[in-house]
C-alpha cells in the first residue's frame, strides 16, 4: 500500500473531541488516514466516508477494516452529500471533515497528477468521467486555457503558457505530464525557473481544478454540510491553496453573519515546522473549523 500522510492530524483530532453525538462524515476519505485516527479516538462515532475515487475507497476499506461495523463507505462527490445522507436515512450529522488535497497515493499511481514522472495527462479523481487533462490541453481554445490557468492557477505567465500550449499542439498532441511541464518550464524566464516550487505547479493545479470541477463542488459541498449539521455540530475544512481557502473563509463568514455558525479558528491553523519537515506536501495546508449554533 502506498503511504498516505494525514495532514494536520493532531489538530483535527483535537477538534474532533468537541463532537457530540455519533454521526461523522469524512467527505474526502482518501486513504482513510484521518478517519482511522478519529474512529480510534472517538469510540462512539459511526463514520460515513465519501470519495469519488474507486481506488481510494478500496484503500480506505482495507485501512479501516478493524472498524467495519462502524463505517459506511460511499462512492460519491461531497457535493451530493444531501443525497447520500437521504439514501442512508440520516437527517443530520454531528461532524464533518473536508480535506481538499490530492492524496499521496493519487500522486504516485500514474494518474497524471504529477509532473515528476512521464505519465498520461489524466488528472481525473473519478476515473469513470469522460473529461481528462489531455482533452483540456489539446482541445480548449487559447482564451479558455488562459482563463483557466490565470484564474485557477493564479499564474502570472498564463498568457504565454496558453499560447505555447496551442503552438506546440499544432505540431503534435500533448500526451504526457512531462511534455506539458516542459512547455510551461520554457515559458518562465531562466532566473525564475528554480524557485521554491516547480514552474509547472500552478498550471497543473489549474488544469486539475478544471478537470474535476473542484471549486464549484467545494462551494456546494460546504453549503450542504453546514445546513446538515446538528446543533453544536463541527465542520473542519483543510485547503491547500488560496482559492480553496477563500471559499471556506467566505462560506464560514456568510453563516456566521446568519447566526448559524460559530467560527472556532480566528485564523486558519497551519502545519508545524516539524510536520512540514516530515511531510513537505503539507506546507500550504490551512485548517478552518466552525460549530453550528
From Swiss-Prot:
Record's catalysed reaction(s): cytidine(1402) in 16S rRNA + S-adenosyl-L-methionine = N(4)-methylcytidine(1402) in 16S rRNA + S-adenosyl-L-homocysteine + H(+)
Gene Ontology cellular-component annotations: cytoplasm
Broad EC category: transferase
Entry EC no(s): 2.1.1.199
Principal subcellular localisation of the protein: cytoplasm
GO MF annotation terms: rRNA (cytosine-N4-)-methyltransferase activity
Alphabetical keyword list: Cytoplasm, Methyltransferase, rRNA processing, S-adenosyl-L-methionine, Transferase
Pfam families linked to this entry: Methyltransf_5
GO biological process: rRNA base methylation
Subcellular locations according to the entry: Cytoplasm
Region ranges (Disordered): 272-293
Binding site for S-adenosyl-L-methionine: 32-34, 51, 78, 99, 106
Similarity annotation: Belongs to the methyltransferase superfamily. RsmH family.
Function comment: Specifically methylates the N4 position of cytidine in position 1402 (C1402) of 16S rRNA.
Name by which UniProt lists this protein: Ribosomal RNA small subunit methyltransferase H
Source organism of the structure: Sulfurihydrogenibium sp. (strain YO3AOP1)
Lineage: Bacteria, Pseudomonadati, Aquificota, Aquificia, Aquificales
Gene name for this UniProt entry: rsmH
Amino acid at each position: 500500500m502506498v503511504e498516505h500522510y494525514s495532514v494536520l492530524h493532531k489538530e483535527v483530532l483535537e477538534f474532533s473531541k468537541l463532537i457530540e453525538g455519533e454521526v461523522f462524515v469524512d467527505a474526502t476519505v482518501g486513504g482513510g488516514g484521518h478517519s482511522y485516527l478519529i474512529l480510534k479516538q472517538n469510540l462512539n462515532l459511526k463514520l460515513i466516508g465519501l470519495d469519488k475515487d474507486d481506488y481510494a475507497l478500496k484503500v480506505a476499506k482495507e485501512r479501516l477494516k478493524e472498524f467495519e461495523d462502524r463505517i459506511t463507505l460511499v462512492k460519491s462527490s461531497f457535493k451530493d452529500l444531501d443525497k447520500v445522507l437521504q439514501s442512508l436515512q440520516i437527517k443530520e450529522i454531528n461532524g464533518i471533515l473536508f480535506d481538499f488535497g490530492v492524496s499521496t497515493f493519487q500522486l504516485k499511481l500514474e494518474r497524471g497528477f504529477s509532473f515528476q514522472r512521464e505519465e498520461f495527462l489524466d488528472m481525473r479523481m473519478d476515473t469513470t468521467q469522460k473529461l481528462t487533462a489531455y482533452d483540456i490541453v489539446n482541445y480548449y481554445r487559447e482564451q479558455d486555457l488562459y482563463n483557466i490557468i490565470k484564474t485557477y492557477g493564479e499564474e502570472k505567465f498564463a498568457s504565454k503558457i496558453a499560447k505555447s500550449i496551442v503552438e506546440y499542439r499544432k505540431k503534435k498532441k500533448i500526451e504526457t505530464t512531462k511534455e506539458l511541464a516542459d512547455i510551461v518550464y520554457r515559458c518562465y524566464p531562466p532566473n525564475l525557473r528554480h524557485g521554491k516550487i516547480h514552474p509547472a505547479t500552478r498550471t497543473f493545479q489549474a488544469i486539475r481544478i478544471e478537470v474535476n470541477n473542484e471549486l464549484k463542488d467545494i462551494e456546494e459541498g460546504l453549503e450542504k454540510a453546514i445546513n446538515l449539521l446538528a446543533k453544536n455540530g463541527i465542520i473542519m475544512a483543510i485547503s491547500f491553496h488560496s482559492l480553496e481557502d477563500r471559499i471556506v473563509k467566505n462560506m464560514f463568514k456568510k453563516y456566521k453573519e446568519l447566526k448559524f455558525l460559530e467560527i472556532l479558528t480566528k485564523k486558519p491553523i497551519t502545519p508545524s515546522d516539524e510536520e512540514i519537515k516530515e511531510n513537505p506536501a503539507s506546507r500550504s495546508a490551512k485548517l478552518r473549523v466552525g460549530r453550528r449554533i
